[in-house]
Amino acid sequence: MDSLLELNRVNTAREIIRKKIQNTGRNSIYDLTGLCGGFEICEENLKLIETYVGPAIFSEKLNNAGLSHLSGNSKIHNAVCFNRTSSAILSTIMTLSKSFEKLVHYVPEKPAHPSIPRSCKIFGMEYFESDSLEEILSKIDENSFTAITGATMDHKVVSEEIACKIIDYAKSKNSPVFFDDASGARLRKLYKESPALEMGADLVVTSMDKLMDGPRAGLLAGDKNLVDKIYSEGLKFGLEAQAPIMAAVVTALERFDLNNLKDAFERAEKVDLSVFEAEKIEYKKTPTGFIIKNSSEEKLIETALKLLENYGIVTITAAGMPGASKNIRIDFCSKDAERISDEYVINAVLNSLK
């Protein structure tokens, strides 16, 4: 979809949200995106969110909490923070494009998040994407940089068996492995899959507001030498997280509780969506909710805006960034999901599709 049309969609959604909050308050909005968001900073840290003092304090705390969250080893790994996961990806590809000619990207289900192919295009890096293991293995060589998506935008999770095969093969070809685990770092824990760094990935990035209560920031961890190079490049272009974001990320990491995700997982398993089948609506359950599909992006956007206007339900389809999947994803891990019943959500979807 054209980027200006995407911007118009975002602005329309923001205007609806703004008016609803002005007229009836925040409780009239139900953010079910799964990008929970949060910017909690304790009183002690609030006094330290200064340009140079803040990073001096929070970088160490963030490294420790980040490595713990991503199961890193402090002897060989570092963790740093960028202002967006897309910023971390951009900085990673900017750095690795100096040593490798192409990026070979495995996704459990196409398409990949647009930030990866777009970054490759900026730096003239050849890009190949596939959800076929055989195709991916045939493309990996000493001139390639390998990427794996841990969970797609619609929350399809990579199998650990496939991930390990790709990592092992890439290692044999001296191709570094980057794990895009934006939501997967937490989602895959529900399936008791191994963390990316434990599987042997050289780098992993995860988003601090996806399936957790942190700010919209990217946490990058992995091989110390690679992380230092990537962070150094990011600093040149202002891609790094500033003190307030770092402080909020530290809080989110220290307070993360997988049980909240497990509750959403159980709710998603139990929710009765048989009415969608009766109405011949294409849908699919996800680990923490469900998605509504349609061959027409325009129809999905129209439906999502109706959901927002008439029922106060915020979805990525309506309010998400340009390039995001247009399937309507309802995510029960969002904080607002606690205030809303399954029946309300299902009826809202049914009525909005009419």
Swiss-Prot record:
Which regions span the lipid bilayer?
none
Q: Which cofactor does it need?
A: pyridoxal 5'-phosphate
Q: Where would one find coiled-coil regions in this protein?
A: none
At what positions is N6-(pyridoxal phosphate)lysine found?
210
Q: Which GO terms describe its molecular function?
A: L-seryl-tRNA(Sec) selenium transferase activity
Give the record's keywords alphabetically: Pyridoxal phosphate
| Gene3D superfamilies tied to this protein | 3.90.1150.70, Type I PLP-dependent aspartate aminotransferase-like (Major domain) (3.40.640.10)
Q: Which NCBIfam families does the annotation name?
A: pyridox_MJ0158 (TIGR03576)
Provide the family line. Answer: Belongs to the UPF0425 family.
Can you name this protein?
UPF0425 pyridoxal phosphate-dependent protein MMP0002
What species is given as this protein's source? Methanococcus maripaludis (strain DSM 14266 / JCM 13030 / NBRC 101832 / S2 / LL)
